[in-house]
Amino acid sequence: VDHANFPDPMIQQLQAFTPTLAQAWSLLALAIVFEVIGTVCLRLSNGFTAALPSVLLFVCYALAFACNAFVVKTLDLSITYAVWSGVGTVATAIIGFWLFRESATTLKLVCIGLIVIGVVGLNTASRVQAS
């Protein structure tokens, strides 16, 4: 289906939407929230035997990718993916430690700290590049 000539004005507006830098970062944050919720639902789905977490898993992942489809119109893919996966990894690890009582070893915590440093560095690099 060729959506370029799709008569629905909502589709046309979505196609034309290119987020500002602030909107792109906000959408990226929203994508991370959806991805983390989806990942928690993956754990709660118990191998897709629990219906609600299984459905929420797919819905949240779809929403995360939908947000990122707009983010990459403004931010570099390398920055988008690194921040998305880095922050998502840290948030998921923290939830794992807290909610699922997973072990929080010194090595795990140091590695999570390194991820945070990397995400801050990438965020700074993208802001320097934009100015």
Where are these regions (language model features)?
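Polytopic alpha-helical membrane proteins, predominantly small-molecule transporters/carriers
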Residues: 2-131
